[in-house]
């Protein structure tokens, strides 16, 4: 018997074995990336992240301690900063725009369990973060969310729904608290230091 109550038959055993081997390979890759996250050189970490499938540019920065799930589903734009100890989930695609500043300890998920289902199956939803977004420390972004251009997410906020352009959201769950008073978003976040 399989763990969710379905019988294992001769017909479906080979695909299950292959799927399990793929899962083990992914888990091994994620374990290696966890260790890579603590290499003190930004450039060496980026090389390993790129080799694991993360689509990122030379001008983006991922600080130490970042963790990933399904790196091949993650795209990071130009001049974007990912802070220390962030978690990035690529199971249903995670697209992060250019000039985005994601502070430390931010969690971005695009998969969660259906708590109303008897089988507790996964529910996937891609996450899109547009250009010039700032996400404060320890914020949580949940599956299926789009964060509009120039939006600001306050520290500790839990984002459960789409956020329009240039709005400031805070709280649990996050709600609009202000509009961002800026007309022309054209700043650069700066270059990373060698050992960041």
Task: Locate predicted features.
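Flexible, glycine/small-residue-enriched loop-and-beta-strand segment within the central core
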Residues: 40, 45-46, 64-76, 81-146, ...
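Short conserved AdoMet
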Residues: 57, 146, 164
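Residues that flank catalytic or metal-binding motifs in active/ligand-binding sites
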Residues: 104, 155, 165
């Amino acid at each position: 018997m399989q763990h969710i109550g379905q019988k294992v038959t001769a017909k479906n055993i080979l695909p299950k074995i292959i799927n399990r081997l793929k899962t083990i390979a992914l888990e091994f890759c994620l374990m290696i990336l966890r260790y890579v996250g603590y290499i003190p050189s930004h450039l060496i970490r980026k090389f390993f992240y790129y080799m694991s499938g993360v689509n990122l540019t030379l001008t983006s920065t991922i600080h130490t301690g970042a963790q990933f799930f399904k790196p091949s589903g993650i795209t990071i734009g130009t001049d974007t900063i990912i802070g220390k100890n962030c978690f990035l989930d690529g199971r249903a695609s995670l697209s992060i725009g250019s000039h985005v500043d994601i502070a430390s300890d931010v969690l971005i998920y695009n998969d969660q369990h259906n708590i109303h289902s008897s089988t507790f199956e996964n529910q996937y939803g891609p996450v899109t973060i547009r250009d010039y977004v700032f996400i404060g420390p320890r914020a949580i972004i949940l599956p299926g969310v789009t964060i509009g251009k120039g939006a600001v997410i306050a520290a500790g906020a839990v984002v459960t729904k789409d956020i329009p352009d240039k709005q400031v959201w805070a709280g649990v769950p996050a709600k609009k608290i202000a509009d961002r008073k800026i007309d022309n978003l054209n700043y650069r976040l700066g270059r990373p230091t060698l050992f960041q």
